[in-house]
């Protein structure tokens, strides 16, 4: 019985160039996704020079007129009538 067992490695074909390209491309994609998720989670401290410049445009945003008030829930918007041809 022991002589009947075959312990030789299975015959597996070598991966082709496209299979290798797909494999390593998927690895690179996964690493890129991890870097993107970490960039969102981990905040990066800004330098003092970068903080001074954005403060100027913010003051311009404050001077803008506020948007129109949201219409009340009870009022229905007017229906636009289609032109008859």
Curated annotation (Swiss-Prot):
Q: What membrane topology is annotated for this entry? A: Single-pass membrane protein
Broad class of where this protein is predominantly found = membrane
Q: Which UniProt keywords apply?
A: Membrane, Transmembrane, Transmembrane helix
GO annotation, cellular component aspect: membrane
Give start-end ranges for the coiled-coil region(s): none
Record Pfam families: UPF0239
Q: Where is the composition biased (Basic residues)?
A: 75-85
Instruction: Outline the segment boundaries, as ranges, of region: Disordered.
Output: 48-85
Transmembrane domains' residue ranges: 24-44
List the subcellular locations: Membrane
Biased composition (Basic and acidic residues) is annotated at: 48-64
Q: Which family does it belong to?
A: Belongs to the UPF0239 family.
PANTHER family in the record: MANNOSIDASE, BETA A, LYSOSOMAL-LIKE, MANBAL PROTEIN (PTHR14409), PROTEIN MANBAL (PTHR14409:SF2)
Descriptive protein name = Protein MANBAL
Query: Could you tell me which species this protein originates from?
Result: Homo sapiens
